[in-house]
């Protein structure tokens, strides 16, 4: 019967007393009920440092929750500027990112993770389609003629492009040497166009060029020009970003047969 278990034999047949909970609308709020440091102390569903799980999971540590809020408010240019603080290639990443942020999104425990990568892709695509694109502000040197230190970046893959972006942002004029005829490294030669369009890569590189970086294609450092020769030309610093584009076979019989090749070489060709 309904309520038959309310009586306890241990209580002598009496109905046990249950602790009453104070309802929020009947609570008198004072300094003992809340903390002025709530925003800093409340770290439920966050990393130990207080950082949101999505930002912690992101290899670039992009301020995910920040640009999502800006996008929700329709402030797309500000959202793009915030993304580019940590990720200079958002249009590329919006297409090929493996979405670790969404794997860590706590909304996924309720229904589905926030579509973080799609929002980033939308913000970046909006900029690609704009008549006037967003070019991050560059530090203006106080001395006449700007910074005179010449910096060489060897390789125009993701690492080399990122280095060129942040150096240009700080007011330097880096020179990027790339042995291929197009920038991007494995972005260009390792990812098929149906997944990542080549014109998207070119568009991202164009922004870095507008910021002040110089690109020299078809120049292989070590063969066409040596480091000593570059030093003689006045280069004071070098950033080596030649990549690690080696492939590997499956380790099965017959892999040494004629016309058997690794995936990296196949994609490049």
PLM features: what roles do these ranges have?
Residues 80-87, 119, 187-235:
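N-terminal Rossmann-like dinucleotide/flavin-binding domain of flavoprotein oxidoreductases
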Residues 88, 157-158, 182:
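Residue-level detector of alpha-helix initiation sites
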Residues 149-175:
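N-terminal Rossmann-like FAD-binding beta1-loop-alpha1 element of flavoenzymes
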Residues 172-188:
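Glycine-rich FAD pyrophosphate-binding loop
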Residues 175, 214-218, 261:
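General small-molecule cofactor/ligand-binding pocket signal
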